[in-house]
Amino acid sequence: MASKNPQNALVMQSGGCTPVLNQSLSGVVSTAAASKYISTVYGSIHGLEGIIEGQFVDLTALSDRKWNKIRRAPGAALGSTRRKFLTEDAPRVISVFSEWDIRYLFTIGGNDSAGTALELSHVSKSMGYPLTVMNIPKTIDNDLVLTDHSPGYGSTARFIALAALGAGHDALSMGRAAPITIIEVMGRDAGWLAAASALAKQKNSDAPHVICVPEI
């Protein structure tokens, strides 16, 4: 149950960066800041590392001009991390949350970030600390369960489709000198990005001619 008095929220970014990672950050902050239940929205520097070290920045204090730059910036404005939550981190994390009066946590990330969000939710409940946790999907792999398309996938899919089409034209131009081009894309155990390489095809002769996905 939400407190009658406004309390603070914390946002963290983690995992690999996507072209729209900072767009999600901006959306979370602007929406949270407009809530009557939230007083201040903080950002954790380098994700979970920043939480453990208590390194936060006040995101509600940033000007609209600053946010316009952040939304269009590549990378992760808050800094990202690959560090996973460990059981021994629990006392320190809850202590920091209590010190900063953090009652709402927004994690922006993919599989590992969603796992961290779930762990923090369980830990806060087991330790009797009131914390609402929400994960904002972020993965170019597009492999989050029950998520039709994750922010970051569309931009990367477009890039790969154009790259495949361009590589095909290059190979055609080179003729016998370099008739075959092999492109390896990211995606972990999902073939969504590989499949996206065909999005720019207009006729059968256009590249790619063979697509290999892990599901098949």
Task: Kindly label every feature range from the protein language model.
Residues T18-V28, I51-I52, L86-P91, N111-E119, ...:
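Short glycine/serine/threonine-rich phosphate/pyrophosphate-binding segments
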Residues N8-T18, A76-S80, R103-G109, N135, ...:
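Short glycine-rich or small-residue beta-strand-to-loop segments that form or flank ligand, phosphate
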Residues V96, T107-G109, T116-P130, M134, ...:
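Accessory alpha-helical/coil subdomains and C-terminal extensions
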Residues V41, R72-S80, S205-V213:
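Short beta-strand elements in bilobed, periplasmic/extracellular small-molecule ligand-binding domains
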Residues A2-Q55:
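N-terminal phosphate-binding or glycine-rich loops at protein starts, especially the Walker A/P-loop
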